[in-house]
Amino acid sequence: MADIKNYTLNFGPQHPAAHGVLRLVLELDGEVIQRADPHIGLLHRATEKLAEQKTWIQSVPYMDRLDYVSMMVNEHAYVMAIERLLGLEVPVRAQYIRVMFDEITRLLNHLMWIGSHALDVGAMAVFLYAFREREDMFDMYEAVSGARMHAAYYRPGGVYRDLPDTMPQYRASKVHNERAIKAMNEARSGSLLDFIEDFTNRFPKYVDEYETLLTDNRIWKQRLVDIGVVSPERALQMGFTGPMLRGSGIEWDLRKKQPYEVYDKLDFDVPVGVGGDCYARYLVRVEEMRQSNRIIRQCVEWLRRNPGPVITDNHKVAPPSRVDMKSNMEELIHHFKLFTEGMHVPEGEAYAAVEHPKGEFGIYAISDGANKPYRLKIRAPGFPHLAALDEMAKGHMIADAVTIIGTQDIVFGEIDR
């Protein structure tokens, strides 16, 4: 009699639910997963090595391209590491701007997650709803940096420039008539802060819409409840952070436990899940969207009341203003040196971590006193989560592998680096 062998199946890297370039070798007993072996490296771009050949400031745009769904949060960890090496004080207004854009980025990430996760499982409508809101937030990115995704807006010592007083307007086109254009531009008639405030007033209603579609949906719960269960002890042992750790019932958030910038001055709650399954992680992330909206509102209120500088006045680190350059030879020299040679960072090492939408994103930077990093190590939050896929998927059906990949919120830019 022939032996009954397990069936080996390749999932990805071209699968639409693979979230990029994941190749998963699955060992199946019928439709039940016995082993899941993730093969990574298909998006490896040697970011850490490239950073060693660029000046400190030239590597800021590389950070955007790591987790390309959470652009500015990646930059934040990198510039914080440089600031620790330099011992730099960041102006308070710049800190509030950074925190506000960190939370806008968290919303961008979570909207992409909820849309793609639901689409993978079979709920198509949420994807279209989520991208409607993402469009407004890309406009916020564009208003401050000129780019809709890869902003390169944060700088060692602050941010590139202050918030603009005007918002880009929609123009007449063949697609929209004048009345539609006028309605679309209504929220854009004021400053960027006005536009963000208007968005924060609208956003809770949008989250309610997602919850109406999903939270009590019978099919959604059947696909997520008791799938990919991770106990609090195992979550800690496997190095989980962010919503993956909080979904297992452990209250750990760097914004509360190791506050950076002005998070200790802001009022928000840390949602914690019960059960450690895919549904618990879904509820945690949905509540995180509401809390991020609260933080953004507080930042808008503070920024309205408190004008001030948005970058350090140390011109060995930050470029002087264009006006000063035209009247002062020394400022012109600073500008020239900064953009040709770059700044020299004192010898030492620093680790800076931020509460990234996916977990703890850390930058470990070593300087030998030169104008380039001696070594740059990136701590990607998604890496330990993907390593746990085998344990989370074992014993589940093959269709549940898609749910588990979705709940991990994986992006390969940061995993492969």
From Swiss-Prot:
Entries under NCBIfam families matching the protein: NuoD, PRK06075.1
Keywords: Cell inner membrane, Cell membrane, Membrane, NAD, Quinone, Translocase, Transport, Ubiquinone
Membrane topology value: Peripheral membrane protein
Keyword flag Manganese: no
Function of the protein: NDH-1 shuttles electrons from NADH, via FMN and iron-sulfur (Fe-S) centers, to quinones in the respiratory chain. The immediate electron acceptor for the enzyme in this species is believed to be ubiquinone. Couples the redox reaction to proton translocation (for every two electrons transferred, four hydrogen ions are translocated across the cytoplasmic membrane), and thus conserves the redox energy in a proton gradient.
Subcellular location: Cell inner membrane
Species this protein is from: Cupriavidus necator (strain ATCC 17699 / DSM 428 / KCTC 22496 / NCIMB 10442 / H16 / Stanier 337)
Name of the gene this protein is made from: nuoD
GO molecular function: NAD binding; NADH:ubiquinone reductase (non-electrogenic) activity; quinone binding
Enzyme class: translocase
Membrane recorded as keyword: yes
Full protein name: NADH-quinone oxidoreductase subunit D
Complex formation: NDH-1 is composed of 14 different subunits. Subunits NuoB, C, D, E, F, and G constitute the peripheral sector of the complex.
